[in-house]
């Protein structure tokens, strides 16, 4: 499947900046990946002494394979990059556009457990304006990968800068990491905040303060 122009531009921008998720070119189709994941997941679950003949577990390897390829790791395939609607800013709108409390669910690439939180994104329109729902979809696309929050924040920033043809973009993410909450230190109350600021959001203290203050 040919990639969209938007997907090609965003991927190239991330590669240029060293912000792309570490991944190899895929040599398998989606169905081939599911078959191979299912096979290896059967081995893993068997090694954990689970009885896959039980009707509750029999389909678990296939369910996991489908979930990985079609859902929680679907952002590894740029063929799934959202269809983007960007229009010329003919109205000359030049005030901050903000989308707040975007639901965010990702997966920690170190332990493959959940990252759960929200994102707030703002930009100052220059030449282009993007459909608001597309911002949510871009966040979701990059969240549907094994991730670290710092990279995810930067990836969303660069994607929007590329598509909007402006550096004036800001991204803030607040998330709970289940690799901290459900294992290891088992801290159930802490959360992690990351920001990525570009253009005027980085260079102008007043604009930066306005974004960060309203994002609390």
Curated annotation (Swiss-Prot):
Hydrolase found in the keyword field: yes
Molecular-function GO term, any one: GTP binding
Known pathway: Cofactor biosynthesis; 7,8-dihydroneopterin triphosphate biosynthesis; 7,8-dihydroneopterin triphosphate from GTP: step 1/1
Example GO BP: tetrahydrobiopterin biosynthetic process
Superkingdom of origin: Bacteria
InterPro entries (alphabetical): GTP-CH-I_C/QueF, GTP-CH-I_N, GTP_CycHdrlase_I, GTP_CycHdrlase_I_CS, GTP_CycHdrlase_I_dom
GO CC entries: cytoplasm
Record field: catalytic activity: GTP + H2O = 7,8-dihydroneopterin 3'-triphosphate + formate + H(+)
Keyword Glycoprotein tagged: no
Keywords in alphabetical order: GTP-binding, Hydrolase, Metal-binding, Nucleotide-binding, One-carbon metabolism, Zinc
EC id: 3.5.4.16
Record: residues binding Zn(2+): 108, 111, 179
PROSITE patterns, alphabetized: GTP_CYCLOHYDROL_1_1, GTP_CYCLOHYDROL_1_2
Pfam family for this entry, one: GTP_cyclohydroI
Family to which this protein belongs: Belongs to the GTP cyclohydrolase I family.
Subunit-level organization: Toroid-shaped homodecamer, composed of two pentamers of five dimers.
Stored HAMAP family: FolE
UniProt protein name: GTP cyclohydrolase 1
Organism in which the protein naturally occurs: Shewanella baltica (strain OS155 / ATCC BAA-1091)
Gene behind the chain: folE
């Amino acid at each position: 499947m040919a990639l969209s122009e938007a997907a090609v531009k965003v991927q190239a921008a991330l590669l240029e900046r060293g912000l792309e998720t570490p991944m190899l070119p895929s040599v398998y189709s989606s169905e081939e990946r599911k078959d191979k994941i299912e096979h290896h997941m059967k081995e893993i679950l068997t090694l954990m002494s689970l009885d896959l003949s039980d009707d509750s577990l029999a389909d678990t390897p296939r369910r996991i394979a489908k979930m990985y390829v079609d859902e929680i790791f679907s952002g590894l395939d740029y063929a799934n990059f959202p269809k983007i609607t960007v229009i010329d800013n003919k109205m000359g709108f030049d005030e901050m556009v903000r989308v707040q409390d975007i639901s965010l669910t990702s997966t920690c690439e170190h332990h493959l457990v959940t990252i759960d939180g929200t994102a707030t994104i703002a930009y100052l329109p220059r030449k282009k304006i993007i459909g608001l729902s597309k911002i949510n979809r871009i966040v979701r696309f990059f969240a549907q990968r094994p991730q670290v929050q710092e990279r995810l924040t930067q990836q969303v920033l660069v994607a929007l800068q590329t598509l909007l043809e402006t550096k004036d973009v800001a991204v803030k993410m607040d998330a709970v990491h289940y690799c901290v909450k459900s294992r290891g230190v088992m801290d159930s109350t802490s959360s992690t905040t990351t920001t990525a600021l570009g253009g005027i959001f980085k260079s102008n203290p007043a604009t930066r303060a306005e974004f960060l203050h309203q994002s609390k």
